[in-house]
């Protein structure tokens, strides 16, 4: 059963990373930030490696989101290894713990000097944690999925 919780956590992490990215894009639209944390980390990594991706800004944005979703997948799986159905408070606390690692460890280690955006980043991580917890519970509540041959009509409420 533990492996199912880990897989659900990984799935929930992907879902939550997308929601978190959307929250950050809304903050950008509102003029609160210039770039998302994954974009800055990707810029720094590409600069250190001397890599300028073909495709320009769009390619850098894509790589930043792919890496961000991988981190979300990993973080969700780690939570699933600890608990199968985390409550919302647990999820938010987990997201804030990840934010502390990001804010106090990762960004300073990469010599990223923030001139704003800490509150946006903290809220985004809290949202991530809440969504991971919600998605893990909802995924666990779904009926069992199984292969369904195409010659058998599927009558389901699907949305």
Which sequence ranges carry the predicted segments?
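Short amphipathic, positively biased membrane-proximal segments
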Residues: 1-159
């Amino acid at each position: 059963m533990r492996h199912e919780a880990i897989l659900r956590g990984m799935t929930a992490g992907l879902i939550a990373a997308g929601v978190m990215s959307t929250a950050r894009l809304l903050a950008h639209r509102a003029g609160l930030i210039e770039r998302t944390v994954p974009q800055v980390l990707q810029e720094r990594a590409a600069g250190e490696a001397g890599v300028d991706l073909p495709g320009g800004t769009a390619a850098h944005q894509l790589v930043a989101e792919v890496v961000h979703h991988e981190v979300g997948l990993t973080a969700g799986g780690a939570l699933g290894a600890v608990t199968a159905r985390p409550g919302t408070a647990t999820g938010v606390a987990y997201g804030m713990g990840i934010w502390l690692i990001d804010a106090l460890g990762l960004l300073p280690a990469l010599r990223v000097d923030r001139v704003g955006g800490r509150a946006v980043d903290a809220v985004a991580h809290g949202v991530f944690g809440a969504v991971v917890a919600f998605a893990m519970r909802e995924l666990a509540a779904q009926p069992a999925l199984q292969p369904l041959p195409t010659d058998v009509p599927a009558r389901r409420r699907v949305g």
